[in-house]
């Protein structure tokens, strides 16, 4: 009695529904791939890329550009290799004094620190020994030394760069000093109180030492300038590094301060002569 519907209405062919859904999925996936391929880079990315390109170009320019060679600073040995050593002159000392004090003193004070050429004895021409040089600049040494009776003062003061050099100069002066008394004036292993006591108790004719200790003795009234007739600087001698005493910053500073402690004033007054050995 019922109509024959053939296949049941709920039974559909297996391939219909299943085939339609995958087709849609494939279509969507292809569209998404296309979108990915056509994706336009953002503004930030473009700026970043431009910066990277610019940096790389600048780096290439720097690599290709010739590098500037740094000038090698000349050493003392380089200068001596090109030019023979020259003896120090009064002008050398005058120039150093002016350069050291020009920004620290008034115009009037600088005038008082000027050392006229008349304050100097003949400088060493690099042919002398210490004894022969002293004999030349102190022709009346024998008479001066015999008449010297004052304590706390010396007739001749020799200024050098170090304690070791002081000991060398004491040996070199033997041919000149005769029977006169020599005292070493440096700080190494010797207390300043002991040096002051020795100067107070004994008559000393020659003092040899470093500028720092000599100035300290003058400042503490251990060494008087009243009897001093000659002030000699070990100007031309060079150490193992080929430095003269005024090439060593600390020694240079102490030497110029020593000159300012009354020695320039004494030389300008005519009681003291300066020599550059």
Curated annotation (Swiss-Prot):
Biased composition (Basic and acidic residues): 24-34, 53-66
A Gene Ontology cellular-component term: nucleus
Location of region: Disordered: 1-91
Alphabetized SUPFAM superfamilies for the sequence: P-loop containing nucleoside triphosphate hydrolases
Amino acid composition bias (Acidic residues), ranges on this chain: 1-14
Pfam families: CMS1 (PF14617)
Biased composition regions of type Basic residues, renumbered to the chain: 35-52
Family per similarity comment: Belongs to the CMS1 family.
The protein, known as: Protein CMSS1
Annotated organism of origin: Xenopus laevis (African clawed frog)
Gene: cmss1
């Amino acid at each position: 009695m019922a109509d024959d519907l053939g296949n049941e209405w709920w039974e559909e062919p297996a391939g219909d529904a299943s085939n339609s859904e995958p087709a849609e999925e494939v279509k969507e996936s292809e569209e998404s791939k296309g979108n990915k391929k056509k994706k336009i880079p953002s503004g930030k990315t473009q700026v970043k890329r431009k910066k990277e390109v610019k940096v790389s170009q600048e780096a290439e320019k720097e690599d290709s550009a010739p590098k500037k060679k740094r000038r090698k600073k000349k050493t003392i040995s380089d200068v001596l290799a090109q030019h023979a050593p020259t003896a120090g002159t009064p002008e050398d000392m005058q120039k150093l004094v002016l350069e050291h004090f020009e920004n620290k003193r008034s115009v009037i004070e600088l005038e008082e620190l000027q050392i006229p050429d008349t304050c100097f004895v003949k400088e060493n021409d690099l042919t002398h020994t210490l004894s022969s040089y002293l004999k030349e600049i102190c022709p009346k040494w024998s008479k001066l030394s015999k008449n010297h009776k004052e304590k706390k003062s010396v007739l001749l003061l020799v200024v050098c760069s170090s304690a070791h050099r002081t000991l060398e100069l004491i040996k070199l002066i033997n041919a000149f000093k005769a029977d006169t008394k020599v005292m070493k004036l440096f700080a190494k292993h010797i207390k300043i109180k002991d040096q002051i006591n020795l100067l107070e108790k004994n008559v000393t004719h020659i003092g040899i030492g470093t500028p720092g200790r000599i100035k300290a003795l003058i400042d503490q009234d251990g060494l008087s300038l009243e009897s001093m007739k000659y002030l000699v600087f070990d100007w031309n001698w060079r150490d193992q590094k080929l430095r003269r005493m005024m090439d060593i910053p600390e020694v240079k500073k102490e030497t110029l301060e020593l000159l300012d402690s009354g020695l320039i004033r004494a030389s300008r007054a005519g009681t003291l002569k300066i020599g550059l050995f």
